[in-house]
């Protein structure tokens, strides 16, 4: 049985060469090795792109993103594409696990500091602060054991691992996810 991998993107605009080189090319190769789920993270998009113009474009961006992914070689017979907001159970998981992590832990993540720099009025939404916890809900919700990320998102996976450890110790047994950093698998918890 193949390990389960979660990958995806926010439908903030058109995919470009940077997406291909930075992630998609690798994901095409990884779909051969892993049971692959590609999440179109529309809820995550709202944490930084909640203006009407982005919401109005989200539907078309979602369609274009999936078409582009298939066009570059992601096989819908090997990769399950899904829209984050279409899975209500993910929100239930998020509501539970947000109580398992200290807010200071997520406020201190480098990715939050970087993403908050792009705020137009120097404010940070609660949704943006909770971004790593929502990502953890996505990972836990489908039982992903591998998550390909760039260096800028390793802290999200570390938050996920902390939440999973708490769940294993205090609540339920689930599989601990690992970071898949492009071609290098980093085993943080051996």
Please tell me what each predicted stretch does.
Residues 113-190:
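Active-site cores that bind ATP or allylic diphosphates and position pyrophosphate for catalysis
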Residues 2-137:
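N-terminal Rossmann-like or analogous alpha/beta NTP/dinucleotide-binding catalytic cores
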